[in-house]
């Protein structure tokens, strides 16, 4: 099955590669020429605008980092909404429930179905094909793209058929991921400054009740190596935390712990960390603690 792919950056490019690996034809578009090149070398075709992509392809995937970017490619000049061939739009972005509902209504007026399909696992999971894929939308549309989106991960969870249901599911995941990273950063700096070997801490925590996505993946991969290259920038995580807090407020759910994690990352952002890797939050905790953990890997 041929498809279009808009946004082939840190997440979109490896996900597009998985579609090519499975024999699907792809037409791609990205404002970054260098991001498209590896896919073009594998015989993907180039679109010249979002509208051109939607003029050529019945199925279009979108992987973009921000709501503003998605809004522009959807509704801006030469946007997807102006295309004539697109019938199914698959949103893999974390953009929050209100925007998903907005784009679902706008596209429905044009005869286009929207499948909400946010993913979790970061660039490493996208490259390995081990993402957690969350999906919601019209059951027939979901089933049509299931063989394609299943290529990205080891699990596919259907959150329901309501617009935005998968966004809510993704935000629950991101709350836990962000809180775990902030808490793990503080815990490890405290322990190391108190004289503990970070590797000893890691082994004990991962064998006990404190293990989490930071201790099992982010710290071994990008913190204890001092590489801080997990592959996702801090401003993207902050955007997701903001969406989660807003969702909680809309539903009348107190988000005190999430708010505390937001303060940790907001403090780092005010120190210029917006474009740093999200694991670099450890360096900001270290700076405020007057202590730097040793490289152990």
Task: State each model region's role.
Residues 7, 199-207, 259-263:
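Beta-strand segments within the central parallel beta-sheet cores of soluble alpha/beta enzyme folds
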Residues 161, 270-297:
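NAD(P)-dependent dehydrogenase/reductase Rossmann-like domain
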Residues 50-114:
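Rossmann-fold NAD(P) dinucleotide-binding segment
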Residues 128-129, 133-136, 157, 163-194, ...:
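Active-site-proximal catalytic alpha-helix in oxidoreductases
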Residues 1-63, 87, 93, 123:
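NAD(P)+-binding Rossmann beta1-loop-alpha1 motif at the extreme N-terminus of oxidoreductases
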Residues 94-174, 178:
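Rossmann-fold dinucleotide-binding core
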Residues 167, 176, 212, 216-277, ...:
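Interdomain hinge/lid region at the active-site interface
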